């Protein structure tokens, strides 16, 4: 196998592992939050780092995971010989292969991620709504993480070097 192809395969393996690690850390952070969060609870605990640190981690890791998955999906498309000239084509390929449920679901998740990248301010009702919406979409991203890894292994024989994170994700409630 030529070195460029081998390098590309190694890069995808690294993206898969980074995605699985990030997904596991996202779940671990989310597990530290008493869901659903409410406006009243956020206001009452506004200086409580035991609540706000894991919320900040959920916010950060949700966006990071989507970024990692987007890069991994594009790279998978390249290695599979698909047209990756636009991300919409990448999403269409991934939807066709069952990696994502639908282009629309991914785009809705992405819109939520884009909101997560901005300051959520002091409106506790909006903040609670934002975090509860993120929490509701975590299973979507976990599913994409696992299906992407399964597809890469089944079609290209590529997998993350460390299987522990994928195993932990599969057994996570």
Question: What positions do the PLM features span?
Answer:
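Solvent-exposed interaction patches of small proteins and small membrane subunits
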Residues: 1-173
